[in-house]
Amino acid sequence: KVKLLLDALRERGALIVFNDHPLLTVKLTNQLPALAGGLAGLKAERGTALYDSVVFSLFYFNGVKGQRAILLLSDGKDEGSRFDVEETLDFARRAGVAIYTVGLNIPRSDSEVRKVLKKLAEETGGRNFFIKDSTELAGIYDAIQLELRSRYLLAYQSTNSSRELRFRLVDLEVGRSGLDAKTIRGYYP
């Protein structure tokens, strides 16, 4: 099913799998068979170092030009990461990489896990989804590819001459009804 997303994007991708640690399974490539092959036979086992794996993925993007996004498929639980969610978000903000989260089989009652996946997506300019069955992935991949293809890059130069390197919030409003604008929550100068 990831093949559907990669076919639609006609871009490059890498595959990083994780359990108790992240592992680069397929380096950045535009060869769909390599990515599809890397996905074959994956199964959940051992712990889930979710935050460490996201940070690892963000570092992998260092030096990669163009639009960059992470598609995170997970049950949302983190077990044993050295990083916490706030540190992970800090890395994501600095990297400027959108995170799209797909929560797999997460009960509505597990609100904390849902909240974390939603936060990772929304604060990085991505989007979150929750599904019960993998048959729903095709529709999600369509939505993600449409969104990635419909992005615009806006540049802004602050008049704030302060040399402070603190996080600065961004507020973007669209002056036309019926349009939805999504952006990163902020940036570091």
Language model features with spans:
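Scaffold/interface architecture of coatomer-like assemblies
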Residues: 1-189
